[in-house]
């Protein structure tokens, strides 16, 4: 059994998911800052939420635009077809969701997806599909999460990389 766990490439993604999440966060910031640098622009600010309560992971500001960003990720080629988005993000100015498809082995970004409005606009409607908890209760039922919506991949715009993402974020 132990040998099987060591050979399963998904095991570290389960047992060290918070490490993976932080790595992806820092890799994304590095890519955005490097892309900004190549543009000759050095005016990006980054604020990280310490409490996961308001629907966003980070706040980015550049070009006078403030963005509350919820980050999502999945593996390239995975069967994931939707992500869960907090309705609290609707309350934030220029809220948006960035969904990254990453290489399972290297964590390299392979595809970027965007859901959000123009700079200065609020987050578009999240639809009415209420999310459910991923784990069932003692009776096996998966209760609803009334403050969250399932947002399908079809709602997201595919982007070509960090440069296109910066345009979506800040114009």
What function would you assign to each model-found segment?
Residues 1-54, 59-171:
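Mixed-charge (Asp/Glu-Lys/Arg
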